[in-house]
């Protein structure tokens, strides 16, 4: 079994999954506020080449906040 570890990756290394789900108008501002207040509580789940499997709203909120790096778990 592969050991999972949290890494910090630059946001420009990431890209949303091909079949994007729509982020609701309410979800993004709420996530921006949560990241601003508490930071990342749950890392993004990404593939080795940076495709986001889980965490698109967190990713978009990080872009809004102009974060340079985000925590990820590589699946």
What is each stretch, according to the model?
Residues 1-75:
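Short, charged/polar connector segments at secondary-structure boundaries
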């Amino acid at each position: 079994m592969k050991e999972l570890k949290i890494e910090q990756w630059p946001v420009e290394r990431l890209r949303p999954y091909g079949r994007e789900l729509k982020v609701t108008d309410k979800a993004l501002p709420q996530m921006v506020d949560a990241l601003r207040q508490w930071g990342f509580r749950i890392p993004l789940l990404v593939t080795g080449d940076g495709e986001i499997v889980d965490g698109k709203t967190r990713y978009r909120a990080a872009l809004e906040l102009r974060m340079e790096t985000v925590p990820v778990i590589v699946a």
